[in-house]
Structure formats: C-alpha cells, structure tokens
Curated annotation (Swiss-Prot):
This is Transcriptional repressor NrdR. Pfam families: ATP-cone, Zn_ribbon_NrdR. The lineage of its organism: Bacteria, Bacillati, Bacillota, Bacilli, Lactobacillales. GO terms for molecular function: ATP binding; DNA binding; zinc ion binding. It comes from Enterococcus faecalis (strain ATCC 700802 / V583). Belongs to the NrdR family. InterPro entries: ATP-cone_dom, NrdR-like_N, RNR_NrdR-like. Keywords: ATP-binding, DNA-binding, Metal-binding, Nucleotide-binding, Repressor, Transcription, Transcription regulation, Zinc, Zinc-finger. The keyword Repressor applies.
Length: 160
C-alpha cells in the first residue's frame, strides 16, 4: 500500500480488525520508509444496483435519496438521524439480499414504509403521502385508519 505521506510503495500491517459490522476490514499500517502510520479499509465491492422508476427510467441505487426522503418526512418529529440511517441500511440490505441487478422504486418504498410505520406514525403518513401520491382524501383516510387499527390491535388494552 502506498504511503500517503512519502508515497513509498511498501508498508506493513500493524493491526487488522473487522469494521462496519463485519462488512469491512480496518487495517493500521506503517510505512517502511518514513514510519508514518495510516489506516485503510477493505470492503467488498458491491455490484451496481439499478432502480427502475415508475416511468421506466433506470438509475443507480442511491442511499442518500432515501435518507433525504426520510429526513423530510420526519422533520420536527422525535426521530434520530441514527434511526433513519438504520432504516436506509435495512432497506439496502434487504434489496441487495434479493440478488437482483434491478429493483423497483415500489419495492424500495414498501420496505421503507414497513420500517417507518413502527418508528413514527406521523413520519410514515408524510412519507406515504408523497410516495403513494394519494389521488383523493378517501385513500388517505383509509391509510390513516389502517394505522389506527394497527395501533389499537397492538396496544396492551386490546388483549381484554
């Protein structure tokens, strides 16, 4: 590995350990020429994943787009950034585990909503209203009613 300070080609590995929940290897290295210590990360290169949009266009999977949508939907809500990043991680892992080269925005949106409804119902409704593009109030009200029914069925008082 080339030293970032003196550009010498040889360095030795001082320490190696797993990073990023086992998805990467972190290595501490020392340059054999100038003794400068630096860190490198080794990751598996994921095959490009294409997203098929509703209009048929294809573009590369973009975690940041999902995160931006979550941030907008959770604005002024008690949802931590770490929780939103975890949703994005979950969605990406689920999509990549399918083993497909292409995935629809419909499936990605459903995965996001499955995680978001359990985190914050208001953020879920905001996300769903943009994602599902409700055509009229009755569809929107049905979505709200589904959340209310789910909340009632999962509350401790509903076991009586």
């Amino acid at each position: 590995m080339r030293c970032p300070r003196c550009h010498h080609n040889n360095s030795r590995v001082i320490d190696s350990r797993q990073a990023d929940d086992g998805r990467a290897i972190r290595r501490r290295r020392e340059c054999e020429n100038c003794s400068y210590r630096f860190t490198t990360f080794e990751r598996i290169e994921a095959a490009p994943l294409l997203v098929i949009k509703k209009n048929g266009d294809r573009e590369e999977f973009n975690r940041d787009k999902i995160l931006r949508g979550l941030i907008r939907s959770a604005e002024k809500r008690p949802v931590a950034m770490e929780q939103m990043v975890q949703i994005v991680d979950n969605v990406e892992n689920r999509v990549r585990s399918l083993g497909e080269n292409e995935v629809s925005t419909t499936l990605i949106g459903e995965y996001v909503m499955e995680d978001l409804v359990n985190l914050d119902e208001i953020a879920y409704i905001r996300f769903a209203s943009v994602y599902r593009q409700f055509k009229d109030m009755s569809v929107f009200l049905k979505e709200l009613q589904d959340i209310v029914d789910k909340a009632k069925s999962s509350s401790p008082d509903s076991e009586n």
